[in-house]
Amino acid sequence: MGIEVELLDYGATLKSIRVPVGDNFVDVLLSYPANEDYLQDKVYLGATVGRYAGRIDSGATRVQGRSIQLECNEQNTGHCLHGGPKGFSHQFWSVSERSSDHVSYEYVSADGDQGFPGCLTTRVSYRLLGSNTLQIEFTAETDQETIVNLSNHAYFNLNCIDSGVENHELMINSGLYTPLGSNSLPMGEIKQVADSIFDFRQKRCLRERLYSPDAQLDLAGGFDHYFLLNKDVSKAGVAATVYSPQSGIMMNIYTDQPGVQFYSGNWLGAPFKPRAGLCLEFQDVPNEPNMDGFASTILRAGDTYRRQITLEFNCLPGNR
């Protein structure tokens, strides 16, 4: 048996990944009971997020030397979050290709959509590789200079029963992270993870870290921080690993993205409890257009944005 994947046209959403464990399957993603529930979603459950994943400070930035005001949708901060109130996560995508092992979606975002310049054509492809691996590929092209930062917002829970993720073990192949300011955004500062609760270079139990006294955790109610991945990750190194000792399921993630936003599911809302799932949003740094020292998220006409995220699942011996 191999993994089984379920997708939705709305948000080009990754709804379900069922992983074989013994004679049964474990769905490792949080999902709503009915497909119609996704139309009211407020936490981006499994969705493709864009045009810009993460927050942009007050929705204000500059492109081609001119000021741009984006639509803001995060009520408690006034920021533009995940592309605005009608971003990619809240749109119906067209199926451009379909076969037994892959589906490709396409969405055309008009010039000025949510305040972003340029007509942007975006494609998201989900492809099964072998029996235990799912590859997600994002591509985008524009007719004028704009900013692009795409990711998937799946909430993972590798346990085989209805429980949270605090018993999960997490490894992030990163020696650097970006602290948050009081406005829930990176401040442009980069810190070493060494000798801090942000050191996930070896697998760590989330429960041990989540309840450690730390001002950064207090700001976000847990983890909601960006980690810069080590350089060797893009050369087929493992970017992150999640393991559940309860189910025995291990997920290794590979990517060519420069970093990952780790969100410990601090605020989910009904029907979910806090920390029912965790997010690993592989992407560029939030608010990059307003900071110096990070890789540019500018996409120019004639160029192609292309990024991949690969999820590999295994069940460790003794748990089958």
What residue spans do the PLM features occupy?
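An exposed, glycine/acidic-rich loop-and-rim segment of catalytic or binding clefts
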Residues: M1-R320
